[in-house]
Amino acid sequence: MFLNRLLLFIMALCLGSLLVRMHLPIPFLLGGLLTALLCKTLTHRSDVSWPKQWREYALMIAGYGIGSTFTSDTWNNFLAELVGVAEATIVILAASIALAFVTAKLARENLKSCIMGMLPGGMTLTMLLCEEDKEVNPNVVMVMQVLRLLGVVITVPFLVIWLLHAQVTGSSVALPNHGGMHWIVVVPLSILGSFIATKIHMPTPKLLGPILATAAFSVFDGGVQPVPFWLMAAAQASIGLFMGMQLDADRIVKTEKMVPYILIGTAILIVVSIGMANVLSARYGFSLVTAFLAMAPGGIAEMSLAGMSMGENVSIILTYQLVRVLVINIFIPPLLAWWFKAKQA
C-alpha cells in the first residue's frame, strides 16, 4: 500500500512539473487531483486511497503559506470592504440555495440533501450533519459537494488564465519573501494554532488554525519567511491526491441522474461569481482575478493558493472565502433546521 501511494505521489509531482511549464496556477494541486482521477478511472480499484492525516499535514503547510501573506493593512481592508464581503456572501449563498431548489425539483430528490450538497465550502460540516439527520441522503450530498469542488478547482485556473488573462508570476508554488522570522521557527506556532482550532471545534481547523496563527505572528512581528518550494509543492500534491480520491464511482452510479444538474449548477455558480466579481472589482479597485477567486465557490486553500501563484491579493481572497465558510458553518445549519421544522409544523 505504501509503495502504491509513493508511486502516486511521484506521478503527481511529475504531472505538476509539467503543468508548471504550461504556466498554470496551483500546478501540483492539479497534478495530484488529475493523478488521482486517472488512477480511479483507469484502474477501477477500490482499495486505492490517500490518508486523511497526510492531507491534514499538507493543509497545515498551506495554511502557513496563506497566513504569511497577511500584513497590517489586511484588517483595515476588511473593515473598508465589509459591505462588499456581506453582499458577496449573500449572493453566492442565495444562488446556491436557489439552484438546490431547482435541482431537487428536476431530479426529484430530497430538498435538504440538495441544499447541503450545493452549499459552497462546507463539505466537512455538511457530511457531519448527514450523520445526524436521517432525512439527508449522504450519497447525494457527497457527490454534489465533490463534483462541485472538483469542477471549480479544475476550471477556475483555466478561466483566470484564458478568460480573465491572468499571469502566473514566477514559480507557481513560490511565496513572496517578506523577510522576518524563519519558517522553521514559526511552523510550530502554526501547528499549535491547528491544535487549538481543533479543540474549539473551528471549521476546517487544520487549515484555519495555521492561517490565523501565522497571520497574527506575521502582522505583529512584521512578516515571516515562506516555506521552501519543494515543501509547498509536496503539500499541494497531497491535497490534490486526497481530493481526487473522494470521487467514488459507486456513489456516482447511485446518483447518476443528478450529475448533469450538478455540473450545470456549478457552471451557473461560476458565472454568478464572475458577475459579482466585476461589481467588487469596480467598487474597490482590486483586480478582477482577485475578485473572482474571492467569489469562486471552491475551497479556501485552493482559491488562496491559486491567487498566491498569480501574485493576486491573497488577503482579500482569504477574507471573502473565510467569511463565507464561517457563515455556512455557524448560521446555515440552525437556519435550515428551523426552516424545515417550521415547514413540517
Where do the protein language model's features map onto the residues?
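Alpha-helical transmembrane segments and their cytosolic membrane-interface
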Residues: M1-L7, P138-V185
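Alpha-helical membrane segments and immediately flanking helix-loop junctions
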Residues: L106-L147, F286-Q321
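Structural signature of hydrophobic alpha-helical transmembrane segments
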Residues: L19-L34, W54-A58, E81-I92, S113-M118, ...
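Interfacial helix-loop-helix linkers and transmembrane-helix boundary segments
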Residues: H44-A58, F70-E87, T103-L111, H201-T204, ...
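Small-residue-rich segments of transmembrane alpha-helices in multi-pass membrane proteins
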Residues: Y57-T69, V91-I92, M116-L128, L149-T155, ...
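Structural signature of multi-pass alpha-helical membrane transport proteins
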Residues: M1-Q53, Y64-D73, H182-R251, V271-N278
